[in-house]
């Protein structure tokens, strides 16, 4: 069988997909977008007790250096354009984790006139972490779920 036959079956690209996705799962760099009390739990998850560095998660201060955004807390209408702007500054591929009831759907302030009822109305969300506020363990579980999602994606476009 010639190399053309191997390429047509997708063997080379699927192997490259697995390799690329494996390296991405071990080097997630989230950009912290802490808006309320959930940000304290996010900081707790990055501290010494839970140490998210062991999963390859290193918090970055700049959106240009990160590929994951963790939206933690209540998103107000005035902050929504800033959230979108920061999301647009992130390099592809990028993922979003919505952390807490307020970021997921408005939470306690759902019926307030100034609160966005879920950050998924502003940016596409990949993983939802429930809780008010969610524990550090829940955030770590969400990161592990994001790693599993990344492993299942196709990164190299194939011609149909």
UniProtKB/Swiss-Prot annotation:
Listed name of the protein = NADH-quinone oxidoreductase subunit B
Q: What does the record's cofactor remark say about binding? A: Binds 1 [4Fe-4S] cluster.
**What is this entry's stated membrane topology?**
Peripheral membrane protein
Known partners and oligomeric status: NDH-1 is composed of 14 different subunits. Subunits NuoB, C, D, E, F, and G constitute the peripheral sector of the complex.
Q: Where in the cell is it found?
A: Cell inner membrane
**Lineage of the organism:** Bacteria, Pseudomonadati, Pseudomonadota, Betaproteobacteria, Burkholderiales
Instruction: Give the residues the record marks as binding [4Fe-4S] cluster.
Output: 37-38, 102, 132
- The protein's required cofactors: [4Fe-4S] cluster
Q: Which GO terms describe its cellular component?
A: plasma membrane; respiratory chain complex I
Role, per record: NDH-1 shuttles electrons from NADH, via FMN and iron-sulfur (Fe-S) centers, to quinones in the respiratory chain. Couples the redox reaction to proton translocation (for every two electrons transferred, four hydrogen ions are translocated across the cytoplasmic membrane), and thus conserves the redox energy in a proton gradient.
Q: What family, per the record?
A: Belongs to the complex I 20 kDa subunit family.
Keywords on record: 4Fe-4S, Cell inner membrane, Cell membrane, Iron, Iron-sulfur, Membrane, Metal-binding, NAD, Quinone, Translocase, Transport, Ubiquinone
Q: Which organism is it from?
A: Cupriavidus necator (strain ATCC 17699 / DSM 428 / KCTC 22496 / NCIMB 10442 / H16 / Stanier 337) (Ralstonia eutropha)
Could you tell me the gene encoding this protein? nuoB
| One example of a Gene Ontology biological process annotation | electron transport coupled proton transport
Reactions catalysed, as given in the entry: a quinone + NADH + 5 H(+)(in) = a quinol + NAD(+) + 4 H(+)(out)
State its Enzyme Commission number(s).
Answer: 7.1.1.-
Domain of life, per lineage: Bacteria
């Amino acid at each position: 069988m010639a190399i053309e036959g191997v390429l047509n079956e997708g063997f080379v690209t699927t192997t490259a997909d697995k390799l690329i996705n494996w390296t991405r799962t071990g080097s997630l760099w989230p950009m912290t977008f802490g808006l309320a009390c959930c940000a304290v739990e996010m900081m707790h998850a990055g501290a010494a007790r839970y140490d998210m560095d062991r999963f390859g998660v290193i918090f970055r201060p700049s959106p240009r250096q990160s590929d994951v955004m963790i939206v933690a807390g209540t998103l107000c209408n005035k902050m929504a354009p800033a959230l979108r702007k920061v999301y647009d500054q992130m390099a592809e591929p990028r993922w979003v984790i919505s952390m807490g009831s307020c970021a997921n759907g408005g939470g306690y302030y759902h019926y307030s006139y100034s609160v966005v009822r879920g950050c998924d109305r502003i940016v596409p969300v990949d993983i939802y972490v429930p809780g008010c506020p969610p524990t550090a363990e829940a955030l770590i579980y969400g990161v592990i779920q994001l790693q599993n999602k990344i492993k299942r994606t196709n990164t190299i476009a194939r011609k149909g």
